[in-house]
Amino acid sequence: MQYQLLINGVLVDGEGERQSVYNPATGEVILEIAEASPAQVDAAVLAADSAFAEWGQTTPKARAECLLKLADSIEQNALEFARLESQNCGKPLHCVINDEIPAIVDVFRFFAGAARCLSGLAAGEYLEGHTSMIRRDPIGVVASIAPWNYPLMMAAWKLAPALAAGNCVVIKPSEITPLTALKLAALAKDIFPPGVLNVLFGRGQTVGDVLTGHEKVRMVSLTGSISTGEHILRHTAPAIKRTHMELGGKAPVIVFDDADLDAAAQGVRTFGFYNAGQDCTAACRIYAQRGIYDALVEKLGNAVSSLKMGAPEDESTELGPLSSLAHLKRVTAAVEEAKALSHIRVITGGSQTEGKGYYFAPTLLADAKQEDAIVQREVFGPVVSITVFDDEDQVLRWANDSRYGLASSVWTQDVGRAHRLSARLQYGCTWINTHFMLVSEMPHGGQKQSGYGKDMSLYGLEDYTLVRHIMVKH
C-alpha cells in the first residue's frame, strides 16, 4: 500500500508525527502514516515554485497530454483505486467502481481538452495606434485542500483545472482519507515533470496551515466546512492570496402538489443518501406542499426504510458507514437534538446501529419547522427532514432563508413555475425533477456561505487563471 509523499518528483516518507488511518466499516486501523514535516512542506512548495517557470510556459497540448496519460492510468488501475477508496471511506465498492471512477477519469479528460479551448476578448485597436490583446495566464503555486467525503473525486476536481491552466500544485488530502491521493501520487510522478504536482499528508493544524500560509503559494483551493473556510480566509488574508471555496450546503428539495411523488420519493432515496448523505448537495431538506405532504411522508418512509446498510464489499449494500467516529458523534448529536423537539416525528431510523463500524441508520424526520436546527444546519449524514408548505411564495422564502447556497431542486409538472423558482432560488445549481446530477461540462459551485468559485466546466478552468491586458504601441 502506497503511503509515501510526493515531493519534487520523488516519493519520500513523511518526517512528522505518525497518524492512524481507519477503516470506518470496522473501526480498525488500516495503517499509520507519517505526516509531512514543516521542512517537507517548504520543500514541496519551493519545488512547485521552481517547476512553474517551465510548466507555466508549456503549450496547452503538452499539458493536455499529461492529463490524458493520468486519466488513462487511473482507468487502468480503477479496481485498485476503488478498493482503496471503499476501504478508507466505507463507500460501497460497486458505487466507487460504477459511479465515481468513471466520473474522475472524465474530469481529467475534459480539462485536457478544455486547456486547448480558452477564449477571450478579440484583440484589436481600442485606442488609435495601439493594439490590445488579452492573455489568460496561470497563477503560480496552488495549494489544494481536499475533503474526506470524496477524496479522489475532489482531488481530480482541483488538480485537473489547475494543472490544465499551467499552475503547479501542492495538494493535501484529508488526514482521514489519504489513501487514493497517495496512490495517485505514485502514478503522477512518472507523468508530470518534477515539482509540478506534489502530494502531502497531515492534519490541518500541522501541515495545512504551513502550506496555505507559505509565501510562495499564490492561490488556495478548499473543499470543506464553513469553519475551515473561515480559518483559511483569516490565515491567508494578510498575504491577499486568491482563494477558491466550496464550503458545504443544505439543499432544499421543493415538492409541489402536481409533482410525480413516486419519482420524488425515489429521488430523495437515491440523492439524499448516496455516500451515506456525506455530500454537500445531498437532497436533505424536503419541503412538501400541504396537499401531498402526508402522502409524500408515507412514500419517503417506505423508500428510506428499504435502504440496505452493510459491508462495503457486498454488492447489495446501498449505505455504508460514516467516515469517522468523530463524525458519527456529530451526526448522532444533531439527530438527538431534533428528536428532543416535541413536534418532530421519527418516521424511520434516528440512531446509530449496533455492532462495529461507524454506521448510522437512514433517517427521516417529519414535521420539521423552518427554524429547527435540523432544517437550518448541515448534518452531512443519512438524515433527511421534511417540512410542509402552503404556497410558492412561502416555500421560496423558506428555501432562500439559509446561509447555504450550493444546490436545490424543484419537483413540479408546471414549466412556468419551474422557471420562476429556478430564477429566484439563491443556489449555484437548481435541478428540475431530479437532483444531484453533475457533468464535467457544467459548473458546480455555490453562493453565500457555501463559498465561491466553480469546479468543473470552462468556468472552473478560468478560476485558475489570471486575466492580463497587453498593449502594443505602433
From Swiss-Prot:
Homotetramer. It comes from the Bacteria. Keywords: NAD, Oxidoreductase. Catalyzes the oxidation 4-aminobutanal (gamma-aminobutyraldehyde) to 4-aminobutanoate (gamma-aminobutyrate or GABA). This is the second step in one of two pathways for putrescine degradation, where putrescine is converted into 4-aminobutanoate via 4-aminobutanal. Also functions as a 5-aminopentanal dehydrogenase in a a L-lysine degradation pathway to succinate that proceeds via cadaverine, glutarate and L-2-hydroxyglutarate. 4-aminobutanal can spontaneously cyclize to 1-pyrroline, and 5-aminopentanal to 1-piperideine. Pfam families: Aldedh. Signal peptide: none annotated. The active site is at E246, C280 (nucleophile). CDD domains: ALDH_ABALDH-YdcW. It catalyses: 4-aminobutanal + NAD(+) + H2O = 4-aminobutanoate + NADH + 2 H(+); 5-aminopentanal + NAD(+) + H2O = 5-aminopentanoate + NADH + 2 H(+). InterPro entries: Ald_DH/histidinol_DH, Ald_DH_C, Ald_DH_CS_GLU, Ald_DH_N, Aldehyde_DH_dom, Aminobutyraldehyde_DH, PatD. One of its GO terms (biological process) is L-lysine catabolic process. The keyword Transport does not apply. GO terms for molecular function: aminobutyraldehyde dehydrogenase (NAD+) activity; NAD binding. It comes from Salmonella paratyphi C (strain RKS4594). This is Gamma-aminobutyraldehyde dehydrogenase. NAD(+) binds at A146, P147, W148, K172, P173, S174, E175, D209, S225, I226, S227, T228, C280. SUPFAM superfamilies: ALDH-like (SSF53720). Pathway: Amine and polyamine degradation; putrescine degradation; 4-aminobutanoate from 4-aminobutanal: step 1/1; Amino-acid degradation. Transmembrane segments: none annotated. Belongs to the aldehyde dehydrogenase family. Gamma-aminobutyraldehyde dehydrogenase subfamily. Its EC number is 1.2.1.19, 1.2.1.-.
